[in-house]
Design a protein with these regions (language model features):
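Hydrophobic positions on the alpha1 helix immediately C-terminal to the Walker A/P-loop
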Residues: 480
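Conserved P-loop NTPase
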Residues: 755-811
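Conserved lysine of the Walker
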Residues: 477
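P-loop NTPase motor domains
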Residues: 73, 80-99, 106, 110, ...
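Conserved AAA+ ATPase "SRH/arginine-finger" region at the nucleotide-binding site
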Residues: 518-522, 737-746
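Post-Walker A helix-loop "phosphate-sensing" segment adjacent to the P-loop in P-loop NTPases
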Residues: 487-497
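Extended, folded cores of ATP/NTP-driven motor/assembly subunits in large transport
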Residues: 1-431
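Hydrophobic anchor at the beta1->P-loop junction of P-loop NTPases
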Residues: 469
Length: 813
């Protein structure tokens, strides 16, 4: 190789001197290859080099960033103590990042067109008798949707930026940073997750295509990593808008939309923790960005000391001037004294408290369809800033840098900074209230009273979908249950069964095409308490659970305060095993046992304890209350079934509710086999928890329901009685949904202690209007308002106010 090189060198022609024209030509080619440093395409303007599938983004040679999405927490409704805890956790959050890590907090409110209401709410025309109700329901939801601000999707992100030698080093460091960040969000109660590359691109696409949110038919983000190689495109081609225009000094254009970026001048001595929330409540597309970079602690202390030294020098100069002028040297300019005291306080905080110093750049970007709308949006935000003694100032001649600095990439080209301590920085609280706006079979439950956003949730997605509804008479308790029942029938294929002690649900059930079963001594509709099916239990022997029900029933009719004795339980269980043998040998309806068979099996044992139970059963077999001593005559195949037990009277009401609950369990086990859920609504639920044995059986059913696709809901106007039951803990632990309306003073106190409700939250169930209260779902607590338009057919079906019910009946007649 060396010899070849030598021969080449020997034969090479001697270099000649380039002419001036040749040098100019080469210099022109080099300049053209290097470019002029300006972006010539939309893609060139987007300030990053590479986006990787794991979400790591390379901004330039050594700078990398990752983005984490986080959700809201109930800060505004929290108690002062909880707010203080969140504030302290925010301080720890920022203190956890050293000066080598850039932090960008992004709060976005962007309009997104959801398309037709029927697609959003799942209410579709079926061409049947329920279409008028569907149209009515869709109109009501449309009305509530327009009242709220659900067209605007609010999202929150934090983008972290570091420098590293290469990709491997960046990934290794981010692995630690991500874990720490997610843990800090968890401490604050905020759910968070790291965005992957596609999610980050979709986020950027949404910001760079602001007009697409108003066009449901187009503009959706479409991308796959496998498309890059065959197409020869880069990731920027999938997110780039049609055009950027930065020809004006105070505005810019993205495609057909107008935008403007402003910065916040923090001139107030103190900032209120509501300022961020109020920025996000203004109308229009808004993106609030905070670029935060920590200052080395030693450098921060030196900087403050230099400032104090400068202020002291100014103080001495003022004092000398005072002496020369012949007035008191202790009289100093007020600003000088104020700044001097503030600087010393900051120094003390840095040296003795857990305070650090940060540089903050605060940007606010607006987008609108016209310049006029843009100026209105900017002026609204400026008014918010002015309310808190700050100034929102437009970036002159820096709109492009402002836009690129607002993108959640971790890049800050705007060097307008304000130095703040940790406590001063954490006052910009990014939390307001949690939202519930779920997909799937989500149904309407009112508007969030804090944000005015619609509440859409799917109880079946919860770990335990069981629910409770609390409310005083006239608070809207029954109407809330009716509204939920209506939307279940209109938007799902699930079954619904109602236990109606006061005959309040019959008109609604009939209008929705359901079946009303009236249970009373004079009725010919019979339900056999001893009905069973082979799927009655998930255990091998379905009689184990059925025996529990029979024990509960016998204890209820015997009225023993101390409960059944051990021998009594034994003889009942023995009789149960015997009477079901013919049915399991030949499972035909005529072989199903009835209460008379149970009584005979008890008497056949010939012992006093069995005779005592049989004598208690005699009233329900041969006496005046023999209504339940029949085989079932009703066919419960309708999707919507209402058991009207008002006619049972006082003596039969509790047994009737227990028997209905067991009948529901039978239905649940049957429907699970075909993959269909069964919702069960029981009013006056506290009656089932008054007696020890019926309470134990109800709690057991409550636990079993969720495993079998059942969704029970207990409603009561007497939460005090409900909460005094020894089984209430089992009920509450298996109920992730609580709909709490107005409460009496005594009940409020008990509920607050039991459910951990703060005084601020309790105000929403104190003398509240009908349809207003608190909603508990999983770990979320939201105040809600459910004001239905009254001039609709659906409202007339839902209302239980006597005057409105009477008026509706007269109108129908």
């Amino acid at each position: 190789m060396q010899a070849k090189t030598a021969r080449h060198e020997k034969t090479a022609k001697p270099s000649r001197k380039l002419t001036r024209a040749e040098r100019k030509q080469i210099e022109a080619v080099v300049r053209q290859a290097k470019g002029d440093g300006k972006a010539h395409t939309v893609q060139d303007s987007i300030p990053f080099r590479n986006m990787f599938p794991d979400g790591l983004c390379r901004l330039d040679g050594r700078t990398f960033s990752k983005t984490i999405a986080f959700e809201d927490v109930n800060y505004r409704l929290a108690s002062p103590e909880d707010q203080r805890d969140i504030f302290e956790h925010l301080c720890d959050f920022y203190n956890g990042y050293d000066p080598t890590i850039g932090v960008q907090v992004s709060l976005s409110s962007r309009y997104v067109e959801h398309g037709p209401e029927e697609d959003l709410f799942g209410i579709h025309s079926q061409g049947d008798d329920l279409d008028p109700i569907r149209e009515d329901a869709a109109g009501i939801l449309r009305f509530q949707y327009e009242r709220g601000s659900n067209g605007y999707v609010k999202t929150k992100y934090v983008t972290l930026t570091i420098e590293a030698e290469n990709l491997a080093a960046a990934r290794a460091r981010f692995a630690r940073i991500e874990t720490d960040t997610l843990n800090r969000f968890k401490v604050m109660g905020a759910a968070a997750h790291v965005l992957d590359g596609k999610e980050r691109l979709e986020l950027l696409h949404g910001i760079l295509h602001p007009a697409d949110g108003r066009r449901p038919e187009g503009g959706k983000f479409a991308f796959d990593w496998d498309w890059l190689a065959p197409s020869g495109l880069s990731v920027k081609d999938f997110i780039a808008p049609s055009s950027f225009h930065f020809g004006e000094t105070r505005t810019f254009r993205i495609g057909e939309m107008y935008g403007a970026v402003s910065f916040l001048q923090i001139t107030a001595p103190e900032i209120h923790d509501r300022i961020l929330a109020e920025f996000m409540e203004t109308e229009g597309n808004i993106l609030v960005t905070m670029h935060i970079r920590g200052i080395n602690q030693n450098e921060a202390i030196k900087m403050v000391k230099r400032k104090i030294t400068d202020l002291d020098a100014m103080k001495i100069a003022e004092q000398k001037r005072a002496v020369r002028s012949g007035y008191d040297m202790d009289i100093l300019p007020s600003d000088l004294a104020t700044y001097g005291g503030a600087a010393k306080t900051i120094l003390q905080d840095l040296q003795s408290r857990n305070e650090r110093m940060f540089n903050l750049t605060f940007l606010v970007m607006h987008m609108a369809e016209t310049k006029q709308k843009l100026e209105i949006a900017v002026s609204q935000a400026a008014s918010v800033a002015q309310t808190y003694n700050c100034l929102l100032t437009r970036l002159d001649f820096q709109q492009e840098d402002g836009l690129m600095s607002s993108l959640p990439l971790g890049l800050n080209r705007i060097k307008i900074e304000r130095s703040l301590t940790t406590s001063a920085l954490a006052v910009f609280v990014p939390f307001v209230t949690q939202e519930l706006f779920m997909g799937g079979d989500a149904m309407y439950y009112g508007l969030n009273a804090l944000s005015n956003n619609m509440i859409l949730l799917d109880r079946k997605q919860s770990r335990s979908p069981n629910g409770l509804v609390f409310g005083t008479p006239g608070s809207g308790k029954s109407m809330s249950c009716k509204r939920e029942i209506t939307f279940i029938i209109l938007t799902t294929k699930d079954n619904v069964i109602i236990c109606d002690p006061e005959d309040e649900y019959s008109p609604l059930v009939k209008r929705l095409g359901g079946q009303v079963i009236r249970l009373s001594p004079s009725s010919t509709d019979y339900v056999n308490p001893l009905d069973i099916n082979l799927n009655y239990s998930d255990e091998e022997n379905p009689l184990a659970l059925k025996s529990d029900f029979v024990l509960s029933f016998c204890e209820l009719i015997m009225g023993s305060k101390t409960g059944l004795e051990a021998i009594e339980k034994t003889v009942i269980d023995r009789a149960v095993q015997k009477i079901y043998q013919p049915y399991f040998a030949d499972p035909r309806p005529e072989n199903m046992p009835i209460l008379g068979d149970l009584m005979e099996a008890l008497l056949a044992q010939g012992i006093p304890e069995a005779d005592r139970v049989a004598q208690a059963l005699d009233l329900y077999v041969n006496g005046s209350l023999n209504f339940f001593n029949h085989r079932t005559t009703v066919d419960i195949r309708n999707r919507l079934v209402c058991f009207d037990i008002k006619g049972l009277g006082k003596n039969l009401k509790k047994p009737g509710m227990l028997i209905v609950q067991d009948a529901v369990w039978n239905t649940v086990t049957i429907k699970r086999a075909i993959g269909r859920s069964t919702w069960y609504f029981v009013d006056e639920f506290h009656l089932l928890l008054k007696e020890e044995q019926t309470a134990a059986y109800s709690a057991e059913i409550w636990k079993r329901f969720r495993k079998w696709g059942g969704v029970p809901t207990g409603a009561t106007q007497n939460p005090k009685d409900l909460l005094s039951s020894p089984e209430i803990e089992n009920i509450l632990e298996n109920s992730d949904f609580i709909y709490m309306l107005n409460q009496a003073a005594g009940d409020r106190k008990i509920l607050a202690e039991r459910l951990g409700i703060s005084a601020e939250q309790l105000a929403y169930v104190t003398n509240s209007e009908p349809g207003h209260g608190l909603l508990f779902f999983n770990n979320v607590i939201l105040p809600f308002a459910d004001d239905f338009p009254k001039d609709t057919e659906l409202y007339k079906l839902l209302t239980t106010k006597p005057s409105e019910v009477e008026h509706a009946a007269e109108t129908e007649a």
